[in-house]
């Protein structure tokens, strides 16, 4: 019973702490993201999604240290592009 009460108090404390430390203007952040997305829909030349990266390495070329992302067109690098 004591453990249950302690867990309830801990959850309530953490919930209150989350609300106290939350960003006060977080709704403006979401609004700005919405406006940016809307602008990119209206002006497709401004969209980063339509840009193609022609500087990437084709499969089989050396890319360096194993990583995700990197210079490979596929995004997978394990010493050679996948």
Swiss-Prot record:
Originating organism: Conus amadis (Amadis cone)
Location(s), subcellular: Secreted
Similarity-based family: Belongs to the conotoxin O1 family.
Signal peptide: 1-22
Post-translational modification: Mostly non-hydroxylated.
Protein's name in the database: Omega-conotoxin-like Am6.2
GO cellular component: extracellular region
Modified residues (6'-bromotryptophan): 76
Annotated domain remarks: The cysteine framework is VI/VII (C-C-CC-C-C).
GO terms for MF: calcium channel regulator activity; ion channel inhibitor activity; toxin activity
Ion transport recorded as keyword: no
């Amino acid at each position: 019973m004591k453990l249950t009460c302690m867990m309830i108090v801990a959850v309530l404390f953490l919930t209150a702490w989350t609300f106290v430390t939350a960003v006060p203007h977080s709704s403006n952040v979401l609004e700005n993201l919405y406006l940016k997305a809307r602008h990119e829909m209206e002006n497709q030349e401004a969209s980063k999604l339509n840009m193609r990266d022609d500087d990437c390495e084709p499969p089989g070329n050396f890319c360096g240290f194993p990583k995700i992302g990197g210079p490979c067109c596929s995004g997978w690098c394990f010493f050679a592009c996948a």
